[in-house]
Amino acid sequence: EPMYRFRIVAVLTIICAVILYGMPGLSRSQPERGDRAIVIDAGHGGSDLGVRIADKTYEKDLNLRLALALQKELATSGYRRVLLTRSADKDVSVKERSELIRKTNPALVISLHANAGFSGKARGYELYFPGFKTGKEDRNDPAAIIGDMTKNKHLNDSVRVAQHIQKQLAEIFPKENRGLREAPLPLLEGINVPAVIIEIGFITNKENRKKLDDEKSRQGIAQAIARGIREGI
């Protein structure tokens, strides 16, 4: 039938476009690095302290300091559009963070957090990528097919960037890699963009906390994450 043939042609056209877009030689030449937005999400903030310990070390503060350092490193690397979901110690709702991401449609979202354990022994870093649910739309609908293919591409991009960051952080946290796994990211609900969540050390561990709280060490962490991003996108 004419309509069936039209759908087949449309689907094949979409598949070719996605394949060409995903080829390294084409996708990385345009747009230029400086034109690609990156959003850095400093977890918690304001009245939301995040993890806290007895000496009044708050996760929200460590997240923000690292986010600012990472923004600076990426700007130095040629990324002109590096946006923060918060640039100060203030309350920013998940809805507000999501709206920024939705409007920006960035090449990548990096969400920064610090971990905590029941004792001071747990240490190291772990990374997560969001799982993108495929739709239940008509499988003959070209729009539904391209939607799922885009989600799969974003998933692959997320995992690739996470693996590069993971490798770079190994130099800062030797033998403290706690793995890479899938986890939901509420601020990406209904938004499909590449994203990586980084739990960057345990603030309940003295050595990890010192690295996060020390300016020089924090700069080294930011540089490692920036290198991973450059290699991954």
Where do the model's predicted regions map?
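Short, well-ordered alpha-helical segments in soluble proteins
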Residues: T150-K153, L169-F173
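Bacterial N-terminal signal peptides
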Residues: A10-Y21
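Catalytic-core regions of hydrolytic enzymes
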Residues: L26-N140, G147-V161
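Bacterial N-terminal signal peptides that target proteins for export
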Residues: P2-L12
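Conserved hydrophobic/aromatic pocket- or pore-lining residues that grip, position, or stack substrates
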Residues: I40, N63, I165, I198, ...
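Active-site-adjacent mobile loop/cap segments within catalytic or ligand-binding domains
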Residues: T104, S111, N115-S119, A170-I233
